[in-house]
A protein has these predicted regions:
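Active-site-proximal substrate-binding groove within the catalytic cores of carbohydrate-active enzymes
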Residues: 10-14, 18, 99, 107-153, ...
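Aromatic-lined carbohydrate-binding/catalytic grooves of carbohydrate-active enzymes
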Residues: 1-139, 147-155, 161-173
Length: 354
């Protein structure tokens, strides 16, 4: 954590840095395999020097304190031995001033000549990389991963799909928002051309043609503490349009005795999160809820996975609130499969179609 970061804690310096060796994640994967989990995709954050959300786009080599390239490769190889898939977090918008190649000439510039930025995330001071430059860095960095024996199944290009298109007024690389979406799309398309599954933070309609899956697509209340009142009745509008086009993983937390996110995963026919280990506390839905053992979470995920396997390529054709307060909801897929969730009683019913 850089001292200028909004998350830096000068009063508790021991909280500012955390290293989880690749070997620890490898052992965790072995434990998951021993529980009989057949399909796993591991999304790995903070795998490179000098840590999560730092010095992008110059994000290599693999973190030495975590085991370096050798430790990372061992983790990847173990994943593949079990038939699992491995992907990384990466970033080509947040442009950190500490990056060795940082050059403000490649940062997004406003018409008045100023360069917007902030110091909120772990890497401290940053601008925004003009997306005209992003494809170059993607190809450069992924070539380095390949050279070191890291066989990627997927890659997550952070924030590309949860932020609006950027504009740049630098006369050397003028960019409209439409241009920005095109360059971001080019990055995803290049990943796909290399056999790497593409993903980003959430899904915007412009990005659907480029993405295989996303990080998540939570309702807004899921990004706030569980005691925060909902602003309305959450319904899966996005899935009613795009369910058969992109995979959406859903949080599976039982956040309180009255709220279980598993029900939303079922209602939307999404994929489940088995383990989530968020970097920033109380941010992006990373709140402490009721503790669920890995064994119980595995069984919960089995139910959601079974439904997702049967409906992933099907349209979500109907959703309805069966009670006036929305506490009981039903969704139906194009083959007749239906899900009824009672959020008051915390129960569900699944009926499989043809």
């Amino acid at each position: 954590m850089q001292p200028e970061s909004g998350f830096f804690d000068p009063q508790n310096p021991e909280k500012n840095n955390r290293v989880v060796p690749f070997s620890v994640r490898e052992q965790q994967i072995r434990e998951i395999h021993d529980l009989g989990v057949e399909k796993v995709y591991l999304h790995l954050d903070g795998w490179a020097e000098p840590g999560y959300d730092n010095q992008h786009p110059d994000y290599t080599p693999a973190c030495q304190a975590a085991g370096g390239w050798g430790g990372m490769k061992s983790l990847v190889d173990t994943m593949h031995d079990f038939g699992y898939k491995f992907g990384i977090h990466d970033q080509y918008r947040d442009y950190y001033h500490a990056a060795p190649s940082y050059d403000e000439n490649y940062a997004c510039r406003l018409p008045d000549g100023t360069i917007p930025g902030h110091s909120y995330w772990a890497g401290g001071p940053q601008s925004y990389l003009c997306a005209t430059q992003a494809p170059f860095y993607v190809k450069r960095n992924f070539a380095e991963l390949k050279k070191n024996g890291i066989r990627l199944d997927g890659a997550y290009l952070d924030v590309f799909t949860c932020n609006e298109g950027d504009e740049c007024a630098n006369p050397e690389h003028v960019m409209t928002r439409r241009d920005c979406y095109m360059y971001r799309g080019n990055c995803f398309s290049w990943l796909l051309s290399q056999g790497i599954l593409s993903s980003s933070e959430e899904v915007s309609d412009w990005a659907v043609p480029y993405l295989v899956f996303c990080h998540y697509a939570p309702y807004d209340f899921m990004l706030r503490p569980s005691e925060t009142p909902k602003k309305g009745i959450p319904v899966p509008l996005f899935n009613l349009v795009y369910h058969d086009c992109v995979i959406e993983p859903w949080m599976m937390d039982r956040v309180s005795k009255d709220e279980d996110y598993m029900l939303y995963a079922l209602l939307a026919g999404g994929a489940p999160y088995l383990v989530r280990d968020g970097v920033y506390p109380n941010t992006d839905g990373a709140f402490d809820g009721e503790k669920i053992s890995l064994e119980e979470m595995t069984e919960r995920c089995r139910v959601v996975t079974e439904l997702h396997e049967k409906t992933a390529l099907l349209e979500l054709v109907r959703h309805e609130c069966m009670t006036a307060d929305g506490s009981v909801q039903k969704s139906e897929f194009s083959d007749g499969t239906y899900v009824i969730c009672d959020f008051a009683e915390q129960i569900y019913e699944i009926g499989y179609g043809a």
